[in-house]
Amino acid sequence: MDYEFLRDITGVVKVRMSMGHEVVGHWFNEEVKENLALLDEVEQAARALKGSERSWQRAGHEYTLWMDGEEVMVRANQLEFTGDEMEEGMNYYDEESLSLCGVEDFLQVVAAYRHFIQQR
């Protein structure tokens, strides 16, 4: 899972993720927005879940983060499509709406994001 942190001309941090993990970048850009308290909450949940069978989720405005002891899933809240909503012959492209990754990989991105934010 490759990632890149950038600052736009206004100083806002933007996250770009490799193909297949784009939604993780969208989660940082839309939900985190430099809110380190949210990252604290996610890291605390990851520690609490380690070695357990429990799961945890944090629903945001645009994206929901779900986690268990091994895996993190980020999905767009609008992903709740039923088959009737799609025109015949059309497929919904969800690569930028759903992503799965390991907890350790996700926490590495969280730590790198936190470090980048604090480098001002």
Curated annotation (Swiss-Prot):
Top-level division of the source organism's lineage: Bacteria
InterPro entries documented for this protein: UPF0231
Family as reported in the entry's similarity comment: Belongs to the UPF0231 family.
HAMAP family: UPF0231
Protein name: UPF0231 protein CKO_03249
Annotated source species: Citrobacter koseri (strain ATCC BAA-895 / CDC 4225-83 / SGSC4696)
Species lineage: Bacteria, Pseudomonadati, Pseudomonadota, Gammaproteobacteria, Enterobacterales
